A protein has these predicted regions:
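Active-site proximal beta-strand in glycosyltransferases
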Residues: 3, 85, 102-119, 141
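N-terminal strand-loop element at the rim of the active site
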Residues: 5-66, 161
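Glycine-rich phosphate-binding loop signature in dinucleotide/nucleotide-binding domains
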Residues: 78-84, 190
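A short helix/loop element that forms part of the nucleotide-sugar donor recognition site in Leloir-type
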Residues: 175-190
């Protein structure tokens, strides 16, 4: 099976990059041929590219500039139409027509679009992007339900082809708890007026 994953860059200081690294390093790369289409890592950041390449991921490095990356993706897909899966990490309205471009150039690929963001306010342009994503993508992932709704539409989480990729905070496990707060403060001798940040 041949997979194309599209992301921004491979610096290790971001959740998206860490998600990509963790996913690919835990994938059986003897069964799956993975091409990772990414922008060049900023020079001031450590890159996870060496670890991915050592594991067998083929990295296609392109400029970390949105317009240049779209042009490079178009050129790549014109000559590489044999992907079974395209996993597209997206965070913008421009990703919607890019999803359409992928569908036209690789009509047999299963397209997975993956949102990691929630940036209100919602605009009419975003509403149009929702429709375009829903027209061309096969599956929808969000790092949380809110991220899925923001990029793909208000009710996307009601569709059977939407899933949460668990790299967000699980609010059923991590939430304010008055009893736990009181117990921790008592255990460490921290008064109610003192500020406490937990990491």
């Amino acid at each position: 099976m041949k997979i194309l994953m599209i992301s921004n860059h491979l610096g290790v200081q971001s959740g998206v990059q860490r998600y990509v690294q963790n996913l690919l390093l835990n994938l059986d790369l003897t069964r799956y041929q993975v091409d990772l289409f990414v922008g060049l890592c900023p020079p001031d950041q450590a890159s996870c590219a060496p670890a991915l390449e050592a594991a067998g991921v083929h990295i296609i490095a392109v400029p970390d500039n949105k317009k240049a990356r779209i042009r490079a993706l178009y050129q790549h897909l014109k000559t590489h139409k044999d992907y079974d899966i395209i996993h597209y990490h997206t965070a913008s309205k421009i990703g919607a027509p890019v999803c359409g471009m992928m569908r036209v150039l690789c009509p047999h690929a299963k397209i997975i679009v993956h949102s990691h963001i929630v940036y209100p306010p919602m605009t009419l342009t975003w509403r149009a992007a929702h429709l375009v994503y829903q027209l061309f993508a096969d599956y929808f992932l969000g790092c949380g339900v809110a991220a899925g709704r923001f990029v793909f539409g208000d009710h996307i989480d009601r569709r059977p082809n939407f899933s949460v990729a668990c790299n967000a905070v699980d609010q059923t496990r991590f939430y304010p708890n008055a009893a736990a707060r009181t117990a921790i403060r008592a255990q460490y001798g921290i008064t109610e007026t003192e500020r406490l940040a937990g990491f």
